[in-house]
Amino acid sequence: MAPDSRLDFEYGRDITHGKIVLGNRLENPYKTENIAKALASLYPTKAGRVEVDPTDLYVRFLPEDEEQCAELEASGVKLLDHPLDYDIAVDGDWYHDPDIPEGDVTWQYAVVPADYEFPDIPYEVIHKCFIADNSTKTKSGDIDWEAVERQAYVMTGNEDKLQNASSTKAAAKIAPSGRITIVDDRANGGKPFGVAGVRVSCNSFVKFAHTYTDRDGYYQMPKEFAANLRYRLVFENTKGFSIGFNMVLVPASVSTLGKAGPEGVNMTVTSDSEEKLFRRCAVNNAAYDYISRCSYEDMDIAAPPRELRIWLFHSLKPSSAVMIHNGAVLSIELLEKFLGDYSSILKYFMPDITLGMKDVLTYSSIYSETCHELA
């Protein structure tokens, strides 16, 4: 693949990154009842003989603190702060349920296996779902489960979300792929380069796929889709760190990449992009590079601990390596003086490194500030 391929300087310029505004609630095509109806519609003679057993559960959790969030993450649960069966009227990076008091952790939505053992954390099962990719019975037999899935979209009023919805011929499923890059006039000779090791997530309703970019920003999802998808960057990195805090109290910040087709998203982040997105990508690359170079063969220095948590504060100037999440003990009074109004969130999540981003605008200055605190 050519080094300058999959660059897109225009994609994402009109995407907003504030609070998500929900639209109408939609009928979930993956509910077992809806898959069963679609199956009966296409295969009326088999409907009574083929059981549509749940493969997954669409749920929401209400964790009280960091410990409960960590417990969910340790069990492999990927959390989102907004419901999956609503249209999104206005794109954004975060959502807070209006029934949950400001300052408390909002409902966290997820899709878990049907046999998931729930921890002692408040939860609700919203729907029992059937996702053909996750079922062993779809690997054999003479039922076209892709056609059943598509029919479920049609019968639930979601046909417009299918790729080539107006066509009479079903579109082939595609594994989304693309490239996420960043460019700055004073870095890499002004040429775009990859946003490295960051998680890319996409979904249509409760069907998700996740993967990580490589060093050059390329990614390919492990699942195939026929519907349009919502894409996002989750700043949790393969090098063992996460970039957190952006008005939503979860350990890894999210930057939406908006809605696009199943072929994938290419995006080149620039200094003209939304500032939080640009800064997160710059910090991501600085931490990725620094940790990569801590090996004996390179700088031969001790790498930062894994599960490192980096917070960005866009209205503060000072930075610090407080290392609270990794066990350092500091005076609460000193932290409150340093963080000011932000100190109240310490009851939920503990940072290791805080980066003050006020007036830190260029890729090189963000990169330098990050490496300084990591050292």
Labelled PLM ranges:
Residues 157-188, 282-295:
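A short, Gly/Thr-enriched small/hydrophobic beta-strand-prone motif that recurs across taxa
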Residues 2-3, 7, 22, 58, ...:
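Beta-strand-rich domain onsets/edges
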Residues 176, 182-205:
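Short, ordered, surface-exposed loop/turn motifs in non-cytosolic proteins
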Residues 323-370, 374:
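Active-site scaffold of zinc-dependent metalloenzymes
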Residues 204-218:
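Short, acidic Ser/Thr/Gly-rich low-complexity loop/linker segments typical of extracellular
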Residues 220-230:
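Short Pro-Gly-centered beta-turn/loop motif in secreted/extracellular proteins
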Residues 222-224, 271-309, 320-321:
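Zn2+-dependent metallopeptidase catalytic core
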Residues 1-133:
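Long, solvent-exposed N-terminal ectodomains/accessory regions
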